[in-house]
Amino acid sequence: MWYSTVRNPSIALIKQGYHILAEYNLVKEELKNIYAIPSYACGLHWFGVIFVHSGIYAGSVFRFSILLPENFPADISLPTVVFSTEVLHPHICPQNKTLDLAHFLNEWRKDEHHIWHVLRYIQAIFADPEGSICTGQSSSGDLVIMDEVRNMNALNMLAKSRPEYIKRVQEQAILSRNLIYDRPPTEDPHYIIVEPYCAERHLKFMDQLKSPCWKEATSMDCSQPSEYLGHIDSSRQLDEEEANQVEKLHRGRIPEHQREESEVSL
C-alpha cells in the first residue's frame, strides 16, 4: 500500500527535519558575528546570538529566538524573532520583544527564502538603524521615514533626538555584555553558551584549529581577538557579503571540470 507524504505525519516530519538541517548548514556558511542553531528539543525553535562590532550598537550582544511555523517551510507565515532582553530599536516591540519582519518580507516563499536571510536582516537593522526606518526620498531629497513601526518612541527618538538615542543604546550595550554570561534558562544542550575570553584556556583551542587569522589577532597587545576580526560595518558591506556568498554557492554547484574550463577561457 502506498502512503502520501502529506497524510503520513512521520514522513512529513522527516522531510521537515531535512529542510531544517539544510537551513542550519546554510546558516553556518553565510554570515559572520551572528550565530543560530535549532534547539535539541524542537527543530522549529532556534537559539541565536548576535555580536555587534560597529555603528551605534557597537559592543552589544543580543540573544534571540527564532520560532518557525509548524508547517515550515511550506507555510507562507513568517518566522517569529523574539529577543531575550529589551532592545531599543524602532522595529522591535518593547512589550513582547518581537522583531517586525513585515518590512522585510511579505510572506515566506520556501524556494526563495532561508533562515540566513532573517539573520542578515537582524544584522542590517543594527548596522544601519536609520536606513531601516526610511522608505525612500522625497522630491526635495529629504529622507522619508516610516509612519508606523513597532516602537514609535524609539523611532521619534532616533529621528529627533539622536544623541539621547545613542546614550540609551550604549547603556543597553553594557547591560547586554553583563547578561551574556548568565546561566542558561534552559537545559537544552544546543543553547548557545558564551564564556569570558581566557587566553590560558582558549589559546589552546585556537592552536588546535590552526587558524592564522585568530593567531594573528591574539598576538596583538592589550586587545581582544574580536577587535581584529572581519566586521560588517554597513548595509553596503552586508550586500557585498551576500553577493560573495551567492557566487560561492553558484560555483559549488558547477562541476569541477566545468569550473576549470571556465577559468581557462578567462
UniProtKB/Swiss-Prot annotation:
Domain UBC core: 15-178
Superkingdom: Eukaryota
InterPro entries attached to this UniProt entry: UBQ-conjugat_E2_core, UBQ-conjugating_enzyme/RWD
Region described as Disordered: spans on this chain: 234-266
Annotated PROSITE patterns: UBC_2
SUPFAM superfamilies documented for this protein: UBC-like
Residue stretches of biased makeup (Basic and acidic residues): 245-266
Transmembrane annotation, as ranges: none
Name of a matching Pfam family: UQ_con
Family membership noted in the UniProt record: Belongs to the ubiquitin-conjugating enzyme family. FTS subfamily.
Name used for this protein in its record: Protein crossbronx-like
